[in-house]
């Protein structure tokens, strides 16, 4: 049985629009060829289901290199958390505990 993904893939324009909102936003900067990114994806889907007041999105760094450079993403996965239009934290690597901690501290 497959689980439907709940983390929506966005482009740079959609990410910028989402960042301007007042909800906590978690963006997963990923690559399709990245093994740790693939293993983290179902965990992020689960977190999205658990935290309905938090917006989860993902951005393919190969398709949106300019956006990845803007946010200084040099390793995948990198998750950046935004609130009220500002970057408030990031986690580099498939560190599920670190991501959960950052969400709980800011939700």
UniProtKB/Swiss-Prot annotation:
> Catalytic residues per the record?
34 (nucleophile), 37 (nucleophile)
Annotated ranges, domain Thioredoxin: 2-107
Pfam families associated with the record? Thioredoxin (PF00085)
- Species this chain originates from: Echinococcus granulosus
Q: Which gene encodes it?
A: TRX
Disulfide cross-links: 34-37
Q: Which parts of the sequence are marked as the site Contributes to redox potential value?
A: 35-36
Point out the annotated site residues (description: Deprotonates C-terminal active site Cys): 28
What's the protein called, per UniProt?
Thioredoxin
The record's annotation in InterPro entries points to: Thioredoxin, Thioredoxin-like_sf, Thioredoxin_domain
Q: What does this protein do?
A: Participates in various redox reactions through the reversible oxidation of its active center dithiol to a disulfide and catalyzes dithiol-disulfide exchange reactions.
Q: Name one GO molecular function term.
A: protein-disulfide reductase activity
Q: Which domain of life is it from?
A: Eukaryota
Give the record's keywords alphabetically. Answer: Disulfide bond, Electron transport, Redox-active center, Transport
Record family assignment: Belongs to the thioredoxin family.
């Amino acid at each position: 049985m497959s689980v439907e993904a709940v983390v929506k893939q966005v482009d740079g324009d959609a990410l910028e629009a989402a960042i301007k909102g007042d909800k906590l936003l978690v963006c997963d900067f990923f690559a399709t060829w990245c093994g740790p990114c693939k293993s983290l994806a179902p965990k992020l889907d689960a977190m999205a289901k658990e935290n309905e007041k938090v917006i989860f999105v993902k951005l393919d760094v190969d398709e949106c290199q300019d956006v990845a450079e803007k946010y200084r993403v040099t390793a995948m996965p990198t998750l950046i958390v935004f609130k009220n239009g500002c970057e408030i934290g990031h986690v580099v690597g498939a560190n599920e505990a670190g991501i959960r901690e950052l969400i709980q501290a800011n939700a």
